[in-house]
Amino acid sequence: MNSLFASTARGLEELLKTELENLGAVECQVVQGGVHFKGDTRLVYQSLMWSRLASRIMLPLGECKVYSDLDLYLGVQAINWTEMFTPGATFAVHFSGLNDTIRNSQYGAMKVKDAIVDAFTRKNLPRPNVDRDAPDIRVNVWLHKETASIALDLSGDGLHLRGYRDRAGIAPIKETLAAAIVMRSGWQPGTPLLDPMCGSGTLLIEAAMLATDRAPGLHRGRWGFSGWAQHDEAIWQEVKAEAQTRSRKGLAEYSSHFYGSDSDARVIQRARTNARLAGIGELITFEVKDVAQLTNPLPKGPYGTVLSNPPYGERLDSEPALIALHSLLGRIMKNQFGGWNLSLFSASPDLLSCLQLRADKQYKAKNGPLDCVQKNYHVAESTPDSKPAMVAEDYANRLRKNLKKFEKWARQDGIECYRLYDADLPEYNVAVDRYADWVVVQEYAPPKTIDAHKARQRLFDIIAATISVLGIAPNKLVLKTRERQKGKNQYQKLGEKGEFLEVTEYNAHLWVNLTDYLDTGLFLDHRIARRMLGQMSKGKDFLNLFSYTGSATVHAGLGGARSTTTVDMSRTYLEWAERNLRLNGLTGRTHRLIQADCLAWLREANEQFDLIFIDPPTFSNSKRMEDAFDVQRDHLALMKDLKRLLRAGGTIMFSNNKRGFRMDLDGLAKLGLKAQEITQKTLSQDFARNRQIHNCWLITAA
């Protein structure tokens, strides 16, 4: 009896144990990452040929304690290598693990190689050559703390390489894991199986091979036992012949069918090639189509299983499309696949929740470094009185109501950008802004007392409902997360896409960027203030301080300002402002753009203006500004400097986002100024619920 070890992906050990026992293995013992077992020579070959789950089959040769590199050398040399190798066999060493002595795996591999070679030369035998690419024998050494475990890798290349897939192709899951997913899916061979996001077809191919009794090792060309002296070619040929006979019989007797589809024509072509190379191409129908086009291939029965490894996203900007995809799949399953089973393998349990289905079973597994889950569902047959489940129903109803209210108003006023929803319902704590045919959903970061998983799931529900209610393409929804705004974090860079969208606001054309910054380049709550500036600016010299992207300057210019001066500290936003001005035909010397610390520029300037707009941050301590600024504390000093630049009969429009801001009216009077609060006049109906989003004042000479 041979003592053997089969390695596998984490989470598949018990499944592998059952498989090995069915092959005839005895004394199976599960450990993390594999199964120890025993069997005769025939079982060695059967496990290599038939195991769908094992990554490698190892023949342990011994262990040694390693307190120095000499211990490793002597421990390896103690094994009778000359009885292991056939004459002329090449070999390679795979060394993994480190300790205080062996701190480099390449060094460890070199010591093992030296010990093996010296074992031959000391007996005056020809030394075996090393072949790292295609060796006849692979020696595996695993060092854990002070113990080195030495084994022959009888597999050669990993057993997931079945021989039917182009090794250069990108594979989201290995064939061994795919086989486990099929086994755990609840699918019964002889019933239909469908993968609507099949990629290169691995799940369907593994299922078809299982159903037709086709050994996973049948197509492999090289093995790790070709240079092993104990290899029994006669028994191996018997095992191989039996596998070929069973495969032919299984294929001839199988009558059910497999269906695969994907939106990428290139991967579908690869899937067809892989299936043909696996010998089961005639059983699988592959089509190029999107999940949205998915239909039941057998509407009159029999029932089957939908099995897939859907995409998941690591970036925030990919989530809306994935949420929409999973929500859509859930709806299609309920509408067209009543009575079927569904099994999905994913690295994102939250996305699976978007299906709005209750899982009957779930399994955990590792896909490389990723923690994954497989969930199995049974889709109930629909009845005439069954109603589709609503996602975030209260939120969806409010959004639908707001849409009806605001859409007509915005169209009549020539507004393409407006707020549709602003945390109207406390449990759905987001803002939803429309920019032409795009939508930005901003999640206000939930308090730490809220369970993170529940908050994330609620956000996914919000996105699914938003896409459904507004009828937009998922790729036109942008998702952002922000703290409740404390001042304007307008300079925070989020990305580098550089994609700008032209929008209209009354008679102005403006550029917005929905993805690269926390804000988009257009503060929607100031829309009416900008229109007022346009109406007040005819024939006047206009100054815009803390100008951001210059949208107020555009309105002033279009309103007939004699000149405009736009000042901001950011070169990025001044260039953006210049693009906005140019888009509206506002060019030339009468439209100046100045990059400067606005407070320092204000103290040094000696020009005169008829109309000044200033929208400073609530608080700023930027390294590029000379002093820290607090709008509540410093607004009088600001007014003193502004008064010096204000021409007789001129007006200052002063706005800020400080909640609870108190204007020092007595202090203003001492400066010879008076203030009229116009906040309510500047709040449009889409911001009527948030009356503290800004405050706005007109300041003139007393």
UniProtKB/Swiss-Prot annotation:
Keywords: Cytoplasm, Methyltransferase, RNA-binding, rRNA processing, S-adenosyl-L-methionine, Transferase. Coiled coil: none annotated. PROSITE patterns: THUMP, UPF0020. The gene is rlmL. Its main location: cytoplasm. GO terms for molecular function: 23S rRNA (guanine(2445)-N(2))-methyltransferase activity; RNA binding; rRNA (guanine-N7-)-methyltransferase activity. PANTHER family: RIBOSOMAL RNA LARGE SUBUNIT METHYLTRANSFERASE K/L, RIBOSOMAL RNA LARGE SUBUNIT METHYLTRANSFERASE K_L. This is Ribosomal RNA large subunit methyltransferase K/L. Belongs to the methyltransferase superfamily. RlmKL family. Specifically methylates the guanine in position 2445 (m2G2445) and the guanine in position 2069 (m7G2069) of 23S rRNA. It is found in: Cytoplasm. It comes from Shigella dysenteriae serotype 1 (strain Sd197). It comes from the Bacteria. Its EC number is 2.1.1.173, 2.1.1.264. It catalyses: guanosine(2445) in 23S rRNA + S-adenosyl-L-methionine = N(2)-methylguanosine(2445) in 23S rRNA + S-adenosyl-L-homocysteine + H(+); guanosine(2069) in 23S rRNA + S-adenosyl-L-methionine = N(2)-methylguanosine(2069) in 23S rRNA + S-adenosyl-L-homocysteine + H(+). It is an enzyme of class 2 (transferase). Transmembrane segments: none annotated.
